[in-house]
Regions:
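Bacterial N-terminal signal peptides
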Residues: 8-19
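Intrinsic, low-complexity polybasic segments
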Residues: 12, 714-723, 728-730
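Intrinsic-disorder/low-complexity accessory segments
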Residues: 23-184, 224, 230-231, 236-238, ...
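Secretory-pathway/luminal and periplasmic proteins that interact with or process carbohydrate-rich
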Residues: 193-198
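Aromatic- and acidic-residue-enriched segments that line the glycan-binding/catalytic groove
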Residues: 199-211
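Short acidic/histidine-rich active-site segments
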Residues: 259-262
Length: 812
């Protein structure tokens, strides 16, 4: 009996610990089994929302979140709340600054300290910098940025933001008081306000139906969906621009806590350190910082009874697309908590746990995973408990090690401004060229200093007025180097010889993607006095050209590439008009009466054809375009339309239209051919109208991409197929002569320019862009993404020529 009582007490204590933010009285809050004293008159989230964030099946709207923070700031002298701008569709983009009242009264002073430590050149001559920095470090505060809700189906983080803010604003616990004294917390409740309502509206609509907990049948960011967290070096989106310009570049945080969710059948929580590789331009102090902090958080959480925690797995630190802070003096602490079904609880049995692609098996304790989570129910409250506990451990470490964080931050800046070693690249020159202004704009948004010396000569080469010089001995020279040099991703294999899948992609050479020539300079620079920067122009009014009847296929299974395609067409100076066409629209047929061009963005052939399975979504969103859609597209092309297929969508066209083209890498193992997001060289047939005005060589963004070869003797095959088809309009035979190769990979050298490519011999001389004539129309097959994430300006003309008969957009 005594044993049973002790066991029950242990279970009760464990449950009490996990219910860390349940309110127990007007002036207390529970944390780890103890009630913290609270300041009076501070509204709790449930006072405004009507429920506690983390309750099953309860989501807050964005207006409710903003309202809560407004009320919190009015009631607490520890909170300053401000609107930094507007989101893509016009919602307020907000931030709460939380600290001790005396710190909030001196924010300008602390911002100045950060500015000086970030750029030690501003501290005077080298001999006196360390002494001045030591005094600033003694007075300064650790700056912690907490970002939530960038991925809107990961609802735990934006809900947790209110729990975190309330505790900081109301608790009189000495540990919280220490955090407030030693840190300044910049809390962004959501980096994607638009998605909060998109997800809530869909969740509420399906609540109580068989489709409760499904993802919305649209992107949760108007243009990028999940890719909004891949924009931290190109800065294409409004939300990225606001975060960088008004938070990162103003406050220079030492720590960025980026709160996410992951799948439901792996670990309960990921924390750094990250798995290899680390991008070469990430400073060693950053690696040491995220390793120390991530291991501390994991160790403390395990000690408190949290289970299923992994480190050094799954996620890497390779790309600046996800980690702006790593190139700007701050560590990024990514946390990934296991998901439920939006806000609906799930049950995960132990035997349903799945081994991660990299680093750990959730059914076995190891150096990178443990202790075991034995399965069971998983609620939104579990998610918010993991998130808030991790966040307060991070804040505790920042508070207790304030001077160490500031010293590390200063050391990064001090090293960055030190002159480069002789013989190494110490600068880049960017001559005036098409798209150079866009490249320079991205660098400038990233804090990179750019000089315009006028006409000058380096290494016997004369550079004209307007050429830009970027010295690498500057605070963010590493960021510039990462975007202007090519990447050589390491050849990582498992024990079987299979390549290890990178977390995202392997190349981020923005100069190559934009087609901008860059000259590395090794010699010491002696330049004329910098002149005023030349005007860079701006996006003009929205214009179009004849033949602008364009459709973009919008699957009910949302495609990020579809969103990027719309962004490219809508948000530049050219503004090419277009109409979205859904599965239900497409099945109706009669496309040619409304459109001349039909674009199918990158998506798998199976998803395009079949979409969601019946029973997994409401019936109107299932089934893909189906054979009715295929028939409509066939008729559209035969009647004179142009079907443009991007990347994997080309496989759909090859299969459904029985085109005389095959994908030569379709059934090749990853051991023999592998290109996980890299920049390759292509050769263009500039006599073809689609490649007119282009250089003979260009780049291609290749990721899960087909590689084409024309099928010999295809005329007879297609003639026989056409004879059997029972439709009013007979498809013409498609002899090989009706297939035009517009771009191919070079046959005499490795196509790889940046990233990682295995099995390059398999694609030498093969086609990357082809045009197939059918009836009165044509199908254009891109074996790459010509508008990749809004970055590959070098190949925009190929895409624009494919969808505009007589249009050459002004992309200077």
């Amino acid at each position: 009996m005594r044993t049973r009582i002790v066991g029950l007490l242990l279970i009760a204590a464990f449950l009490l610990q996990f219910n860390s933010f349940a309110r127990v009285g007007a002036n207390t809050v529970e944390t780890g089994g103890e009630a913290e004293p609270l300041a009076t008159g501070i509204p709790a989230p449930e006072d405004v929302l009507g429920f506690v964030p983390g309750d099953d099946r309860k989501l807050a709207s964005w207006s409710q979140v903003v309202n809560y923070f407004e009320q919190l700031a009015q009631a607490s002298d520890r909170v300053k709340f401000e609107t930094l701008g507007n989101s893509t569709i016009g919602k307020p983009f907000v931030m709460a600054t939380i600290s001790a009242p005396e710190n909030l009264a001196r924010l300008d002073d602390y911002r100045k300290i950060q500015e000086l430590l970030a750029d030690p050149r501003k501290l005077g001559l080298p001999g006196g910098r360390d002494r001045k920095a030591a005094e600033l470090i003694r007075r300064g505060k650790a700056i912690v940025l907490i970002t939530c809700g960038i991925h809107s189906t990961e609802v735990g983080s934006y809900l947790s933001s209110m729990l975190i803010a309330h505790r900081l604003a109301s608790s009189n616990d000495p540990a919280i008081q220490s955090v407030l004294q030693n840190t300044i917390i910049l809390l962004v409740p959501s980096l994607n306000p638009d998605g909060v309502d998109i997800v809530k509206d869909w969740y509420d609509k399906t609540l109580g139906t068989p489709y409760e907990g499904t993802d919305p049948p649209e992107l949760y960011h108007k243009y990028t969906g999940h890719d909004n967290n891949r924009d931290w070096y190109a800065f294409t989106q409004v939300e990225t621009q606001l975060t960088v310009a008004k938070i990162h570049n103003v406050w220079h945080p030492q720590i960025v806590h980026d709160i996410h969710q992951q799948g439901s059948t792996g670990s309960r929580l990921f924390l750094p350190p990250y798995m290899r590789p680390v991008e070469p331009n990430v400073p060693k102090q950053i690696v040491a910082g995220y390793t120390e902090l991530g291991n501390f958080m994991a160790r403390e959480m395990r000690g408190q009874g949290f289970k299923g925690i992994t480190t050094n797995s799954t996620y890497d630190a390779w790309s600046p697309s996800r980690a702006y802070s790593h190139y700007h003096g701050g560590v990024r602490i990514l946390s990934e908590t296991a998901s439920c079904k939006i806000a609906t609880p799930i049950t995960v049995k132990f035997d349903q746990l799945r081994k991660a692609e990299q680093g750990y098996d959730p059914k076995k304790e190891s150096a990178t995973f443990g202790p075991l989570w034995n399965g069971g129910e998983w609620h939104l409250r579990d998610i918010t408990n993991y998130m808030t506990t991790a966040a307060f451990l991070l804040l505790r470490h920042a508070s207790e090690n304030r001077e160490e964080w500031l010293n590390r931050f200063y050391a990064i800046g001090k090293e960055a401004v030190r002159p480069e070693n002789p013989g190494l690249v110490n600068a880049f020159v960017i001559p005036p060229a098409d798209n150079s202004a866009r490249l320079l704009d991205a660098l400038e948004r990233g804090g990179v200093e750019i000089e315009f010396p006028g006409t000058f000569i380096i290494n016997r080469r004369r550079y004209p007025q307007g050429a830009a010089v970027i010295r690498l001995a500057q605070p963010y020279g590493g960021f510039a180097r990462a975007l202007l040099k090519t990447q050589q991703y390491p050849d990582l294999r498992d024990s079987s010889g299979r390549p290890q899948q990178p977390y995202d992609v392997t190349a981020h050479t923005l100069s190559l993607l934009m087609g901008v020539p860059v000259a590395p300079i090794h010699a010491p620079l002696v330049l004329p006095k910098p002149r005023p920067e030349p005007g860079r122009g701006s996006n003009g009014g929205c214009g179009d050209a004849p033949g602008g009847r364009r459709a973009i296929y919008r699957s009910y299974s949302p495609s990020m590439d579809e969103g990027w395609t719309r962004w490219v067409l809508e948000n530049q100076s050219w503004c090419l008009y277009h109409t979205p066409v859904t599965d239900s629209d497409l099945r109706k047929g009669d496309l040619h009466s409304s459109f001349d061009y039909f674009i199918i963005p990158d998506q798998s052939a199976a998803t395009i054809l079949n979409g969601y399975k019946a029973g997994t979504m409401p019936p109107e969103y299932t089934g893909g375009m189906g054979q009715a859609g295929v028939k409509a597209l066939r008729e559209f092309v035969e009647q004179g339309g142009t079907l443009v297929c991007l990347n994997r969508a080309s496989t759909f066209a090859i299969e459904q239209f029985k085109l005389p083209v095959r994908d030569v890498v379709a059934n090749v193992s990853e051991k023999e051919f592998f290109v996980p997001g890299s920049i390759l060289r292509i050769e263009l047939d500039t006599s073809n109208p689609i490649a007119r005005g282009m250089p003979k060589e260009a780049i291609a963004w290749v990721e899960d991409s087909p590689v084409f070869e024309v099928i010999p003797g295809s005329a007879d095959i297609l003639s026989a197929m056409s004879a059997k088809r029972e439709t009013a309009d007979k498809m013409s035979a498609l002899p090989a002569a009706n297939v035009h190769i517009i771009a191919r990979y070079p046959s005499d050298r490795n196509p790889l320019l940046s990233g990682w490519l295995l099995g390059e011999s398999r694609i030498r001389g093969k086609a990357a862009l082809v045009e197939v004539m059918i009836g009165k129309g044509r199908i254009i097959l891109f074996g790459f993404r010509p508008q990749y994430r809004g970055q590959s300006l070098a190949t925009y003309p190929l895409f624009f020529h494919a969808i505009s008969a007589r249009y050459s957009p002004p992309i200077h």
